[in-house]
Amino acid sequence: MEEAEGVAAAPGPASGLAFRGRRAMSGSWERDQQVEAAQRTLVEVLGPYEPLLSRVQAALVWERPARSALWCLGLNAAFWFFALTSLRFVFLLAFSLMIIVCIDQWKNKIWPEINVPRPDALDNESWGFVHPRLLSVPELCHHVAEVWVSGTIFIRNLLLFKKQNPGKFCLLSCGVLTFLAMLGRYIPGLLLSYLMLVIIMMWPLAVYHRLWDRAYVRLKPVLQRLDFSVRGYMMSKQRERQLRRRALHSERATDSHSDSEEELAAFCPQLDDSTVARELAITDSEHSDAEVSCTENGTFNLSRGQTPLTEGSEDLDGHSDPEESFARDLPDFPSINVDPAGLDDEDDTSIGMPSLMYRSPPGAGDTQVLPASRNEAALPELLLSSLPGGSNLTSNLASLVSQGMIQLALSEASQTDPSGPPPRRATRGFLRAPSSDLDTDAEGDDFELLDQSELNQLDPASSRSH
């Protein structure tokens, strides 16, 4: 049981917050109850004096300026009478109490006896003072009750603080009293009292006419221009810092830029403007097109229209004709006639057209060399005939060579008989026979010796030559 009570006595954070919330709610509820109780008491006390309170409020808010001015003069006269009179304070206090007693006797004893009683119908009804902008007795009592309760709570907390922290309370009270003593030393107490009276008289007027709101509306543009706020002050400080940083960076940049310019000027030679203008000037009386002169500064002076030739540059004036330039470099191309020695089916480089080298027998080799040489001699004219005028030789070189080879092969095929493929295969077998006989003797049985008539039947072209 004791452990459970200990756990309950030590609540967690959530329970502590809930406890504080309940305590605050209970404190506000107690305060409201106190305000209501004080309001009821004040209404009972000030209820009979509602007309007088309404007149005092009207005078304080200057609803009727004439009466308000009279009230203000009377209060000032009374204040300065009590302040400057040579009478003693005890006499003044006794005289004030005597006046208060007389007024009370007149109000409660003498006036009710001489006053005419009201009808019963009027006594049964409750009447109240109504003004659109002035406070009624209940409203005034409510505000006075709130001030009274707030003051009592402050005094209660101050006494509690005195009991719990006597040292701090002593320091706080000494500081406040010292401030009041210094203030009373430099400003007289009479003047402070008069200032308090003026503030009490002018406060209802300021609240009634909303002078604070009007003053704020008028002073707001001025405050925005002057920028007296803390935010504006901090922003101005930040702007000043940024401007200082920019100025420092600009100075550093100018210093570095000047240093770099001085270094570059030390390395670069200084040229005279007249010399440069004379070198750049181009006239007919200067050097010829083939001359290249060197000036004193080490620069080349080239005449008009002249460009020095480098090692890899081309002389365009020497070879202006594209056909001539192509014909000059044509012998450098490799021959298109392939040597048939040692070829078999795997390394055949033909493009499917019959060839004279494969088709001619051993005896007819001399007769077939002449057409091949003719075709080889006619290759440049064939390529030049197919060359388009003014075209780019580099881009069309591959297409021109391939077209020339195909046309040459077709021209050779037109001179032969269409029955060329079978003798080609036989000739290949005949050419491979000597090399295969060197390997083994058994492979010799695969070949058959033919007569001259059979050879003539297989190759009519060779029979014609014989």
Swiss-Prot record:
CDD domains referenced in this protein's UniProt entry, alphabetically: RETR3_RHD
Superkingdom, taxonomy of origin: Eukaryota
A GO MF label: endoplasmic reticulum-autophagosome adaptor activity
Cytoplasmic side of membrane: 1-80, 188-192, 402-466
Subcellular localization(s) per the UniProt record: Endoplasmic reticulum membrane
UniProt motif (LIR motif) ranges: 445-450
Modification type Phosphothreonine: residues: 254, 283, 307, 310, 440
Gene Ontology biological-process annotations: collagen catabolic process; endoplasmic reticulum organization; endoplasmic reticulum tubular network organization; positive regulation of neuron projection development; reticulophagy
Tissue spec: Widely expressed with highest levels in brain, lung, liver, muscle and spleen (protein level). Mainly expressed in the central nervous system and in parenchymatous organs including liver, lung and kidney.
Sequence ranges on the Lumenal membrane side: 102-168, 212-381
Residue stretches of biased makeup (Polar residues): 294-310
Chief location category: endoplasmic reticulum
Function description: Endoplasmic reticulum (ER)-anchored autophagy regulator which exists in an inactive state under basal conditions but is activated following cellular stress. When activated, induces ER fragmentation and mediates ER delivery into lysosomes through sequestration into autophagosomes via interaction with ATG8 family proteins. Promotes ER membrane curvature and ER tubulation required for subsequent ER fragmentation and engulfment into autophagosomes. Required for collagen quality control in a LIR motif-dependent manner. Mediates NRF1-enhanced neurite outgrowth.
Family indicated by similarity: Belongs to the RETREG family.
Protein name: Reticulophagy regulator 3
Gene name of the record: Retreg3
